[in-house]
Amino acid sequence: MFFSLRPRLCGITLTIAWFAPSADAAAQKAVAAPSAPPIRIPFEKYTLPNGLTVVLSEDHSTPTVAVQVLYHVGSKNEIAGHTGFAHMFEHVMFTGSGHVAYGLHDKFTEGVGGGNNGSTSFDWTKYYETIPSNYLETTLWLESDRMGFLLDSLDDTKFRAQRDIVKNERRQYTDNAPNGRDFEVIGLNMYPSGHPYSWPPIGSMDDLSGATVEDVKHFFRQYYAPNNATIAVVGDIDPAQTKRWIAKYFADLQRGKPIARPVIGPSALRGERRITFEDRVQVPQLTITWPSVGFHSADQPPLDVLSDILGLTRVARITKALVYDNQIATNVAAFQNPSENVGQFVVNATPRPEHTLTELETQIDSIIEHIKRDGPTADELKRVKAGQQRASLEQLQANLGKAAQLANDQAFFNDPSYTFTVTFTKTQAVTADDVKRVANKYLGKTRLVLSNVPMGHVDQASHADKSVVVTDPLTEKTAEIKP
């Protein structure tokens, strides 16, 4: 499984702290006060001598526990010609380890009424379990065994079986799914050749076919070490006992070598690039992508608010205009998609019969120009912030969501509470001027306009006469296109 995580709050039990502004704070008129208090979730964080970071959060509302292990490695850590390894290794991690037979991990968690899975993005690979709290010790042992002893049981037969499964995933969800290759086309044309964000986490079929068991063993030795991992344990726990178990099962695992992080450059776009992708689809689709920012940027919160104003709900500007008022589109989406180092602001839409991608693009551009000129209304800001807060609180109901967020924030911000405090407060403090500013800064002429059209119908592309036609994005290079 692979996806990119949109950094909204996700978690479980919370405590809300109310703050009255001091006289000095009230005098700081240049800083907008947040409309909602920050969320406080109790946790304890510490680091073992081998570099493993541990985050514990006690919550006795249900007799369950979630365990999340995050490795700070994703598809951006791969190199051109060896793509798909991070996701493939996610599968390999479920093939057994030195003291755990193949299938036993799944059999145990499911047998006690729990569950487990993994996921991969550009930036991380995660593994999790949700189990009754009286099975926590065994779960920690299972995770420690595959962190420390996975290679003891990995052989070519197991590897080839998982490689075939991943190749089938690519066929099912990318190659043979409607619009399944759109973001592969976007990545290849938005970033320079060899850029770590230019390929999707699933990797290319050629690279998957060429991978060997020795390749993935090398990948494990590079990145699967305690000093590149964070473990979050959340729920019905005794913190003192949990610490003893973590020390028992993880403390003796060997620290890995220092991790070499890739040097990440900017997008290759200079001006507008237009691509027509002939695909096995029945209806065309328009996707407009602007280079934006990663999740460390101060502009991430206002861009997130802007995306919701444009396309989240029925009353969002683009959705309301195209789907409901003018009825020229069947669906619309707008989202700010940040990764650790780069980001993309995306708007896509599918036309109704008898309407065209050119019509959609024209109206989308008009709506964006309007918000760049006048900014959002006070009601829009209020509604979007309330919606984001409600969605966040709704997600704060499960141990697993909380564990995922605590692990994420520790791995990428060195603060398990970052999203619950800093990001939450910054988002609630976004002003109309902030939204107007980022709209003008990022939603300009430097963008990629992708028309996904049925095979043989390149005339259905938006402004087809200005667009370069592609049928195989991996072999037909468009890097030399001049905007």
Per-region residue spans from a language model:
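Mature, solvent-exposed C-terminal subdomains and processed small-chain segments of exported/organellar
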Residues: 2-5, 21, 25-123, 133-225, ...
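Bacterial N-terminal signal peptides
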Residues: 10-21
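Alpha-helical, coiled-coil/dimerization segments enriched in small aliphatic residues
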Residues: 126-129
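Exposed beta-strand and adjacent loop surfaces of beta-rich binding modules
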Residues: 228
